[in-house]
Amino acid sequence: MLISQRPTLSEDILTDNRSQFVIEPLEPGFGYTLGNSLRRTLLSSIPGAAVTSIRIDGVLHEFTTVPGVKEDVTEIILNLKGLVVSSEEDEPVTMYLRKQGPGEVTAGDIVPPAGVTLHNPGMRIATLNDKGKIEAELVVERGRGYVPAVQNRALGAEIGRIPVDSIYSPVLKVTYKVDATRVEQRTDFDKLILDVETKSSITPRDALASAGKTLVELFGLARELNVEAEGIEIGPSPAEADHIASFALPIDDLDLTVRSYNCLKREGVHTVGELVSRTESDLLDIRNFGQKSIDEVKVKLHQLGLSLKDSPDSFDPSEVAGYDVTTGTWSTDGAYDSQDYAETEQL
């Protein structure tokens, strides 16, 4: 098995909607392989939402005007293409726009349904004069990439329903470059620098995560041909390496109380790795191993950055009754009696 130097990924946030990501070190050639794949996926395959059709009261087609509105319908539709919207619904949803002049019509005048969010409410859509009035319905759908208006034209659509070009992609721009980087004595490793700019409906971080997930799913098809095929594997991260080292520690190093220690040894639990493979229920099945011992074990494992098999990630030692996180000691009164902790189990 060939084990490669594990790359790290860091993010430099430039603005709310632009970040620069650095992935290094990569095996020679993989900077361009990974950079090109991520760029194309980011630009074409990130799910988003967009307006797909519009109906304006009194308007039959886009080549006309609305009384009292400065812009013609074609310009109004062009402005609506700049609407940044996100939707949690998989089915098409309808938004409503009703405004009477004088004044500007902005995206903030649109009333979206639950599950739909407008991210640029200040965007100008049209301008009304004293007698101007506009009432419209906008259909929003989820999709990927770019879909021309002709493909959004539904068969049997009502008269006056105007299809719109839909730009679903929430990613505006992606560039990348590959520099050389050094690992020990080798200087031919790749350093991938990826610059991602998005719309306000998604962060660059989430967009990159989505692209990564898509590529993993697709490359998984090739892996399924032979799951035992040999390939380059990346080494563990520093945190994972620490965990691996911790798994080999004997439970003696946890400095448990006599009762907890003897109960675990009698059950055949000798290392931290064997301990973290157990659930709370497994431990409670051990004779004389009660909730007090469970709490003690969870606190000790938390100090190593580990937990029992079914412990929630949100475990907080400060919430454990009788434990003082400041001093790292247990209370000697009430529920956590020192005598109860000091005694050994009765065989």
UniProtKB/Swiss-Prot annotation:
One of its GO terms (cellular component) is DNA-directed RNA polymerase complex. It is an enzyme of class 2 (transferase). Residues 243-347 are annotated as: Alpha C-terminal domain (alpha-CTD). The keyword Nucleotidyltransferase applies. It catalyses: RNA(n) + a ribonucleoside 5'-triphosphate = RNA(n+1) + diphosphate. Keywords: DNA-directed RNA polymerase, Nucleotidyltransferase, Transcription, Transferase. Residues 1-226 are annotated as: Alpha N-terminal domain (alpha-NTD). The keyword Transferase applies. One of its GO terms (molecular function) is protein dimerization activity. Its EC number is 2.7.7.6. Belongs to the RNA polymerase alpha chain family. Homodimer. The RNAP catalytic core consists of 2 alpha, 1 beta, 1 beta' and 1 omega subunit. When a sigma factor is associated with the core the holoenzyme is formed, which can initiate transcription. The N-terminal domain is essential for RNAP assembly and basal transcription, whereas the C-terminal domain is involved in interaction with transcriptional regulators and with upstream promoter elements. HAMAP family: RNApol_bact_RpoA. This is DNA-directed RNA polymerase subunit alpha. It comes from Mycobacterium leprae (strain TN).
